[in-house]
């Protein structure tokens, strides 16, 4: 309450008092209820996926070793660097910013993938390992023992665009574009007798821009259902 006396005049000075009163303020109790309710996770499904991913990682690791002609720690950038640029003789590209040694980051491996299958397989290995460690193995540990749900934290001021962000865990960043990512999403399940309903704005920032600036070409493009990103 003491902060309110300081912050309210600042909101009025900046013309933001109506925004807080009509939009941001009423949103807070909604987010609080969402956080408290949480979301159900099918832990058994994730456990099965973890086992399958572990086997897939092991297969990919063995395939990398066979193609490289040597067994090494695929997770070690140093050892991978030695295999790619010394043993296989591939040309190094960019260097790391800190130590100034040949990089083995994703961009470098993507460049090398056309030259040797090892680089492509390492990319696949890393993606699978990230999904397994970040989501499949981590989510069950975040399930509340009493509610059986995962309870994230939402941040209404976390992004400059006004979009929500979330953390612990970041439920707004669950992958969806790959088959493995979609399988992870399938582990989030609705309450008994309920279904999930998903809706999303299409190009919401540009639509708001068209409304505010009144640009006739931009407005006409939206009304015609055109791809605004291609037009601009």
Task: Describe each model-derived feature in a short phrase.
Residues 1-179, 189, 193-195, 202-205, ...:
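Conserved "right-hand" nucleotidyltransferase catalytic core of DNA-directed polymerases
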Residues 74-75, 199, 221-224:
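Conserved, non-catalytic sequence blocks in retroelement Pol enzymes and Pol-derived host proteins
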Residues 182, 206-207, 230-231:
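Feature representing long, continuous alpha-helical segments
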Residues 224-232:
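Generic long, charged, amphipathic alpha-helical segments
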Residues 211, 215-218:
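Signal-transmission/dimerization alpha-helices at domain junctions
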Residues 185-187:
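A generic local secondary-structure boundary/capping motif
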Residues 199, 209-210:
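Long, highly charged, low-complexity internal segments
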């Amino acid at each position: 309450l003491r902060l309110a006396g300081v912050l309210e005049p600042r909101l009025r000075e900046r013309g933001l008092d109506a925004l807080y009163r009509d939009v941001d303020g009423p949103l807070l109790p909604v987010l609080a209820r969402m956080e408290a309710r949480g979301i159900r996770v099918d832990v058994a499904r994730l456990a099965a996926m973890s086992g399958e991913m572990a086997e897939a990682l092991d297969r990919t690791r063995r395939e990398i070793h066979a193609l490289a002609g040597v067994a090494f720690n695929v997770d070690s950038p140093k050892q991978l660097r030695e295999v790619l640029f010394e043993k296989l003789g591939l040309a190094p590209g960019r260097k790391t910013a800190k130590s100034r040694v040949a990089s083995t980051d994703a961009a470098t491996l993507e460049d090398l993938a056309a030259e040797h299958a090892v680089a492509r397989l390492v990319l696949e290995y890393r993606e699978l390992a990230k999904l397994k460690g970040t989501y499949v193995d981590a989510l069950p540990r975040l399930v509340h023992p009493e509610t059986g749900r995962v309870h994230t934290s939402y941040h209404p001021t976390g992004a400059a665009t006004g979009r929500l962000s979330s953390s612990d865990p970041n439920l707004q960043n669950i992958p969806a574009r790959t088959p493995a990512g979609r399988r992870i999403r399938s582990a989030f399940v609705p309450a008994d007798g309920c279904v999930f309903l998903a809706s999303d704005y299409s190009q919401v920032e540009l639509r708001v821009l068209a409304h505010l600036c009144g640009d006739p070409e931009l407005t006409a493009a939206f009304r015609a259902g055109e791809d605004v990103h291609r037009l601009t």
